[in-house]
From Swiss-Prot:
It comes from Xenopus laevis. This is Membrane protein FAM174. Residues 32-77 are extracellular. One of its GO terms (cellular component) is membrane. It is a single-pass type I membrane protein.
């Protein structure tokens, strides 16, 4: 097993290559039968002529070469191995695509989370009030806001800090 539970392509390819090599090696010990002689002239016609009996009995014209190659089993086996290897590669990539798609759905469950917060600009909600106060302004660095605002506000659990645009003033809004 490879990283993230995937079977590496090298190990699958290596196994299929070993299978292909073993199929060729195992064919080396097998004997291939010679093509069977077939009469050039049908036996019924040869008996009627009588003088051409030497060609029917085994002369140079007596055998017709077979249309099938003696390497047919080896070729078929190589083709089967090639098809199986191609199918294994296709299945591997399909499973990999499905797994990555499932992982992407899990990460997108709550929306886009990998954006850079420094580049994000938040605008205040439209309100009927004529206040310039915003509850949060992402354009100001956190280092300016954090210590100064915390030191200026009383330490009660129910308060909200609002920041006036363009300034570093902190105003505490009390929530009761």
């Amino acid at each position: 097993m490879g990283v993230d539970g995937y079977v590496s392509l090298c190990s699958v390819g290596g196994m299929l290559l070993a299978l292909l090599a073993s199929s060729f090696i195992s064919d080396g010990g097998c004997s291939v039968d010679a093509p069977t002689p077939s009469p050039a002239i049908p036996t019924g016609l040869a008996s009627k002529k009588g003088s051409n009996s030497s060609t029917v009995d085994g002369g140079p014209l007596a055998t017709v070469p077979s249309a099938t190659s003696p390497n047919t089993p080896r070729t078929q086996r190589a083709l089967v191995v090639l098809v199986l290897f191609s199918a294994a590669v296709v299945i591997y990539f399909v499973i990999r695509a499905v797994r990555t798609r499932i992982k992407n759905k899990k990460t997108r469950k709550y929306g886009v989370l990998d954006t850079n917060l420094g580049n994000m600009e938040l605008t205040p909600l439209e309100q009927d009030d004529d206040d310039d106060d915003t509850l949060f302004d992402s354009n100001q660095p956190r280092s300016q806001l954090s210590l100064a605002c915390i030191l200026q506000t009383p330490q009660f659990p129910a308060h909200v800090i609002s920041i006036r645009k363009g300034t570093s003033q902190c105003n505490a809004l009390w929530v009761m």
